[in-house]
UniProtKB/Swiss-Prot annotation:
The modification Tyrosine amide is found at residue 164. One of its GO terms (biological process) is neuropeptide signaling pathway. Keywords: Amidation, Cleavage on pair of basic residues, Neuropeptide, Secreted, Signal. The gene is Nplp1. Residues 29-99 form a propeptide. GO terms for molecular function: neuropeptide hormone activity; receptor ligand activity. MTYamide peptide: Expressed in the larval CNS (at protein level). NAP peptide: Expressed in the larval CNS (at protein level). IPNamide peptide: Expressed in the ventral ganglion of the third larval instar and adult brain (at protein level). This is Neuropeptide-like 1. The modification Asparagine amide is found at residue 182.
């Protein structure tokens, strides 16, 4: 049994080897085209077979077919120029280079006008536009700096800045090149100092600071009016305790006022005949303020009395 399996396996290897040899012998004969250097001697059948192979190649020969397609296009163009019948190839979509979409692929085939695309390569070859050593930085006609320099570092290296190449505010302050000689390096502080008068202090931006600043410079007579806190107003010498002590003292009686007896109102309410015997001075002096105490008992119910208690 093992011998049969080994013989079958060896026969399969032989069949695979024979098929590979047949493919290698037949494939080149179908691809090779007997073309000579003279393009006029190419037969139409050979041209058609060549075009078919170029237009529909196998995926593994895609790059090679693209190169052959470009070569065929160049041959057709040379033939038209030699005959004198120049015909634009753009009408035929088969000859368009739609497969070339990468700049690197176009540059590799020499289809770009400028093969150098890298700034580093152009700089190494000396192809970058540079100014001459004796050429002025500014434009001679307009008197203004050239618009080619847009970077602050380039302007500083070329001497186009007004501060001798210094670009840092801290460096300018250390070198005493700032317009304000007090060493201020903050842009907001510089702007405030430039806008303020020379004899004036720093402008106060806080309400409390403004109030203190005004009270210290010629506004002492209005010191009491500038108080904003009730406690400060109460303890101030103008509006506080001393002002109360300066007023005339009012003497209060030592004993309590002689008010009428509150129970007296209940005595005369049931009988209205004793109005003439009442002392109206005592009644007015009592000044009843509670409605339940003023109304007669007949109109004030027991429930209202309980709620008031």
């Amino acid at each position: 049994m093992q011998a049969v399996l080994q013989s079958a396996h060896s026969s399969r290897r032989l069949m695979l080897l024979l098929s590979m040899l047949l493919n290698a012998a037949i494939q080149p004969r179908s691809i090779i085209v007997s073309a000579t250097d003279d393009v006029a001697n190419v037969s139409p059948c050979e041209m058609e077979s060549l075009i078919n192979q170029l237009m529909s190649p196998s995926p593994e020969y895609q790059l090679h077919a693209s190169a052959l397609r470009n070569q065929l296009k160049n041959l057709l163009r040379e033939r038209q120029l030699a005959v004198g019948e120049e015909q634009p190839l753009g009408e035929y979509p088969d000859y368009l280079e739609e497969d070339k979409r990468s700049v690197a692929a176009l540059a590799a085939q020499g289809l770009l006008n400028a093969p150098k695309r890298s700034l580093a390569t152009l700089a190494k070859n000396g192809q970058l536009p540079t100014a001459e050593p004796g050429e002025d930085y500014g434009d001679a006609d307009s008197g203004e700096p050239s618009e080619q320099k847009r970077y602050i570092g380039s302007l500083a290296r070329a001497g186009g800045l007004m501060t001798y190449g210094k670009r840092n505010v801290g460096t300018l302050a250390r070198d005493f090149q700032l317009p304000i000689p007090n060493g201020k390096r903050n842009i907001a502080t510089m702007a405030r100092l430039q806008s303020a008068p020379s004899t004036h202090r720093d402008p106060k931006r806080n309400v409390a600071a403004v109030a203190r600043y005004n009270s210290q410079h010629g506004h002492i007579q209005r010191a009491g009016a500038e108080k904003r806190n009730l406690g400060a107003l109460k303890s101030s010498p103008v509006h506080g305790v001393q002002q109360k002590r300066e007023d005339e003292e009012m003497l209060l009686p030592a004993a309590a006022p002689d008010y009428a007896d509150p129970m007296q109102s209940y005595w005369w309410y049931p009988s209205y005949a004793g109005y003439a015997d009442l002392d109206w001075n005592d009644y007015r002096r009592a000044e009843k303020r509670f409605l339940g105490r003023v109304l007669p008992p007949t109109r004030a119910t027991a429930s209202t009395h309980r709620s008031r208690l």
